[in-house]
């Protein structure tokens, strides 16, 4: 995928990511990251979400995560208030060099996450559950980011 300026990450399954030639895995929590690092590194990306505290994010970074994710839903689909997510992204971007991925639950969250300093924006149901199609939702997000860039 990288020849198309995109990375293909599997949700977990580091062994499958390596066998299938994916670029890496997104792992949920420090334990999953620790279990997967040897399988993925150094050839593949090991990203980490499911981090409930700033401390957990720092531990993930120290353990070798290539990025940390803020705002991803837990197994029940719950996540912190968006304001708390944006604050965590801003704090991370100011203090650390390891990239931060902000999770946008809606297209309206894309611009504020970018403004907060997210290096990347992850989107879930707002793209894949969009009534007007995933391609249109991604194009909408890109337009929002382009607008944010021209205003900044």
Sequence positions of predicted segments:
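Extended, intrinsically disordered, low-complexity segments
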Residues: 146-152
């Amino acid at each position: 995928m990288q020849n198309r300026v995109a990375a293909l990450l599997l949700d977990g399954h580091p062994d499958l990511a390596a066998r299938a030639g994916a670029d890496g895995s997104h792992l949920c929590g420090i334990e999953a990251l620790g279990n997967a690092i040897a399988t993925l590194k150094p050839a593949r990306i090991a990203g980490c979400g499911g981090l409930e505290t700033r401390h957990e994010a720092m531990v993930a970074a120290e353990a070798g995560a290539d990025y940390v994710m803020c705002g991803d839903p837990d197994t029940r689909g719950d996540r912190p208030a968006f304001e708390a997510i944006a604050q965590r992204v801003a704090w991370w971007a100011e203090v650390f060099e390891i990239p931060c991925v902000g999770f946008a639950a809606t297209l309206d969250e894309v611009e504020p996450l970018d403004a907060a300093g997210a290096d990347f924006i992850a989107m879930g149901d707002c793209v894949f559950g969009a009534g007007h199609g995933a391609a249109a939702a991604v194009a909408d997000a890109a337009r929002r980011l382009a607008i944010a860039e021209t205003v900044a």
